[in-house]
Amino acid sequence: MDKYLVKMPIKSTKNVVSEEKISVKEEKPKPKKVVKEQSAIANKRKNLDTPEIVNKENAEVENPPKRRSTRVTRSTRSMADVGTPSPEKEIPEKLPFIKYRGAIKYFTESQEIAASADEVMQWVDQQTHTEIVPMAFDMEWPFSFQTGPGKSSVIQICVDERCCYVYQLSNLKKIPAALVALINHPKVRLHGVNIKADFRKLARDFPEVAAEPLIEKCVDLGVWCNEVCETGGRWSLERLANFIAKKAMDKSKKVRMSKWHVIPLDENQLMYAAIDVYIGQVIYREIEQREQTKLKNEAEFKEQNGENAFKAVKALGETFLTKINEVTL
């Protein structure tokens, strides 16, 4: 058995330090060393606005704030705090869903669609107080991953937030002349998101529609939003509803990818189609109001402060969507 025994070295008590002594040594503070380390960190971060500086009074003496150059500033709010808003930069927030409670007028036959378009044209002609009548425009068609996009199946329009028109084209070989005349009416300003692509598709599917005249006079809401609000990027209708109208849209994939060519449309499809043009009309009105406010604020500022001050403020990122209360040089 002795050969399997391992002889362990005997610890010497001479080199053993008691645990009490060790703990005392570790607890001794070293204020001088800490101060040197902190001062070294502060020197490395000199001229930087950092919360790690321990002595604020000494830091302010060593690093006085840089003197700002003389320029036009605004006392009411910062002009470019978060940069240019864009669809990619928008922070998702919980917004109430759009609820449309207006009328939905749905037609599938050529004669019914023509009569309805005539009715809308008469309403447009009666708007004598304005030279332009905005009309939200959108389209729907079936889509298959095997065969791609189908023929244009639905046109929906909205000229008044209380009523939306849904025209299903599935049974039509040609679009009624009255509907073509309506969308080409000189007072009508068609608007939507990516609306130019819709007109090109409509012209391919129905040659009696000329795309270019419609493209020349239409308004893309995303482009207009970037011009007025000085935002950037490409907008979807859903993101515009979030940003401009502060509303959420229920863009159900099941409804969006449904069979739009099948007659009749169900209630979910009709509501989906109506909400698209209804919220488009709401967004148009809101951007229009912001544009008018912006032009008014710009004119008042130029009159009070001059063209040079206006250019200086614009260079700082001011949009003039709200009124400037005070300006200092």
Curated annotation (Swiss-Prot):
Tell me which UniProt keywords the record has, alphabetically. Exonuclease, Hydrolase, Magnesium, Metal-binding, Nuclease, Nucleus, Phosphoprotein
Annotated compartments: Nucleus
- Residue numbers binding Mg(2+) 1: 138, 140, 276
Specify which residues bind Mg(2+) 2 according to the UniProt entry for this protein: 138
Claim: Secreted is one of the keywords in the record: no
Recorded GO cellular component terms are: nucleus
Q: Which residues carry this modification: Phosphoserine?
A: 78, 86
Q: What is its EC number?
A: 3.1.11.-
Instruction: Report which superkingdom the organism of origin falls in.
Output: Eukaryota
Question: What Gene Ontology molecular-function terms does this entry list?
Answer: 3'-5' exonuclease activity; metal ion binding; nucleic acid binding
Annotated 3'-5' exonuclease domain ranges read 130-288
Basic and acidic residues compositional bias: what residue ranges? 46-65
An example of a Pfam family matching this protein is DNA_pol_A_exo1
What's one GO BP annotation on this UniProt entry?
nucleobase-containing compound metabolic process
> Which residues does the annotated region (Disordered) include?
26-88
Predominant location category: nucleus
CDD domains per record: WRN_exo (cd06141)
Asked whether the UniProt record includes Lipoprotein among its keywords, one would answer no
What is the protein's given name?
A: 3'-5' exonuclease
Originating organism: Drosophila mojavensis (Fruit fly)
